[in-house]
Amino acid sequence: MIKQITEFEDKQRTRKLYQEAFDDPEIFVDYYYSDKCLDNKMIVSEEDGEVISMLHLNPFCVNLCGTAVKSYYVVAVATTKERRHQGHMSRIFEEAFRILKEEKIPFVFLLPVEESIYSWMGFEKICDFVTDRIPDYEKIKETFDVYCIRDDVYIRRMNKEDYFRSMDNGEVLPNNPVIMAKITDPEAFNAATGQSFSSEKEALSWLKQKKIYICEEV
């Protein structure tokens, strides 16, 4: 059964799969499930009450060429070893895209281990993932067209994750990380940008030409 999880306590049931699938340090996983899971969404596939496949949608407010829009960072995409290659992930993404369109989310982004895993679903590389952070937020706002807006929650989490990285206990990243994006509601994207793109691909081509800053802070 495919379902959306929004309740904090219910989200804890996905931790087992998270730790099976990813090599993040225990201290980071503790932080993720106590803090990041306060306001994110999860789309899961369950069998007999057990989560066998999942993805997480972590919310961010993004400056999209002068317009503040809600977006999601797609993370923790995983399926149990025994149930891979059975279509669970395809169905989870299908449900996620339905929810995102219903919510009128212009686009979402992710950091892939391999681009080919997501390209067939309409995700395309839009920029490199920045590992050397620009500390001056004003400079970011002056220089870039697309970036995450730093509200109080963002700053608190950024500082917490800085601490983990300083202790070498941060999230494990792939080599040469990139950011991929997908247009999830073309009408909302056109409204936010003042454009009139007729296809997702056309909108992504336009987005790729912009100066985009997405850093370890996510």
For each feature predicted by the language model, list its residue ranges.
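A short, internal acetyl-CoA/4′-phosphopantetheine-binding micro-motif in the GNAT/acyltransferase core
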Residues: V74-R84
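Conserved acetyl-CoA pyrophosphate-binding loop and the N-cap/start of the following alpha-helix
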Residues: R83-E95
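Conserved GNAT acetyl-CoA-binding A-motif
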Residues: F93, R98-P112
